[in-house]
């Protein structure tokens, strides 16, 4: 059995779908469906059981065993809102929760894969998995970074796999429930359908309008990385998950415009509250991931966005 926390969420549900496509259906999904619309992410997924987060966490704290042997934990459950500033809430969901799962797995030698984030790098320009390049600029990034730091203490002596995956800007199917935190591609698609225009920020930090750059990575590629590590339990560490190539917001918008065959871009003023906290440039250094043995190519925006919009047309529009 594989346990996927946050399994009804964006990345978690895509990992479950990928596991299904590989023949795995013995999956225990853990989530909090207070936001009930997330259930739709699991409609076409095959799972063994569903547990609410609270009784699951109580079982973990009590050291209870599960009804079936656990092959791995894939921990995607977290508060992923970069605009959330309730530090107590963020630390409980992203740090303390993760620590409890880590120790449960270490004590039983169960592989533990978890979601980290490119937010740990803050506004820096070097994106390598080393302490000197890490300086988060919001409490979300700090909660992820602090758990990475905690994991680093255990990596040298752990007798079972621990893998932290620092996701860059993920986009793709099953993200509609994320609202304002959904991807640029998703918002561009929705805006174009509703108004015929795509809104992007004006220039900032020395970048021209819409020329801010991010490493946009398909959720299908992120799921594939998770499955690869499941298949290679001798590989442990903290790894960036991105294409390794920054692309502009304009390129994302142009990919959406090209798919629909109409529309235009409207540039709007850059919000004052984001100044000094906004990542105008991200580009994953994926040397560590490649050195670990992951050799699959990553889709760039031109291909990945088209594939995504094809899916939206068949499943949501």
From Swiss-Prot:
Which cofactor is essential here?
NADP(+)
Cite the cofactor comment.
Binds 1 NADP(+) per subunit.
Reactions listed under catalytic activity:
ADP-D-glycero-beta-D-manno-heptose = ADP-L-glycero-beta-D-manno-heptose
Highest rank taxon of the organism: Bacteria
Signal peptide range equals none
Q: What class of enzyme is it?
A: isomerase
Question: Hey, which pathway is this one from?
Answer: Nucleotide-sugar biosynthesis; ADP-L-glycero-beta-D-manno-heptose biosynthesis; ADP-L-glycero-beta-D-manno-heptose from D-glycero-beta-D-manno-heptose 7-phosphate: step 4/4
Q: Which InterPro entries match?
A: Epimerase_deHydtase, Heptose_epim, NAD(P)-bd_dom_sf
One BP term from GO: carbohydrate metabolic process
* UniProt-listed Enzyme Commission number(s): 5.1.3.20
Give the record's keywords alphabetically.
Carbohydrate metabolism, Isomerase, NADP
Gene Ontology molecular function, alphabetical:
ADP-glyceromanno-heptose 6-epimerase activity; NADP binding
Catalytic residues (UniProt): 140, 178
Q: Which residues bind NADP(+)?
A: 10-11, 31-32, 38, 53, 76-80, 93, 144, 170, 178
Give the residues the record marks as binding substrate: 169, 180, 187, 201-204, 214, 278
Which is one Pfam family of this protein? Answer: Epimerase
Subunit details = Homopentamer.
State the protein's purpose: Catalyzes the interconversion between ADP-D-glycero-beta-D-manno-heptose and ADP-L-glycero-beta-D-manno-heptose via an epimerization at carbon 6 of the heptose.
Q: Provide the domain comment.
A: Contains a large N-terminal NADP-binding domain, and a smaller C-terminal substrate-binding domain.
Q: What is this protein called?
A: ADP-L-glycero-D-manno-heptose-6-epimerase
